[in-house]
């Protein structure tokens, strides 16, 4: 079990997570997310999706700090694909 307690999400954060879960393992473009969640087309200056993905990641990371759930495909979009974070090695 990854989560031992609930994660308080806003309705928009929940809808974002739900949409990514529906397409689990597939990259969902920012434009698709903007259209499905906010009903509008992407503008190059519109950072709405990025802001909500960041907030959602922060909340999930607090519950499961050893995992990464939302992967970024730079220049394309996001996908929900849980992975273990790499261990950091400190050289003395």
Give the residues covered by each predicted segment.
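Short, small-residue-biased leader/transition segments that mark boundaries at the very start
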Residues: 1-2
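Basic, Lys/Arg-enriched C-terminal extension of HTH/homeodomain DNA-binding domains
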Residues: 66-92
């Amino acid at each position: 079990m990854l989560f031992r307690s609930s994660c308080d999400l806003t309705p928009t954060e929940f809808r974002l997570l739900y949409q990514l879960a529906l397409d689990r393992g597939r990259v969902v473009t920012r434009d698709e997310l903007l259209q499905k969640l906010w009903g509008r087309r992407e503008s190059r200056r519109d950072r709405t999706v990025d802001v909500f993905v960041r907030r959602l990641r922060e909340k999930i990371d607090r519950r499961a700090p050893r995992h990464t759930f939302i992967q970024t495909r730079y220049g394309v979009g996001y996908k929900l694909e849980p992975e273990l974070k790499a261990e950091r090695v400190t050289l003395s």
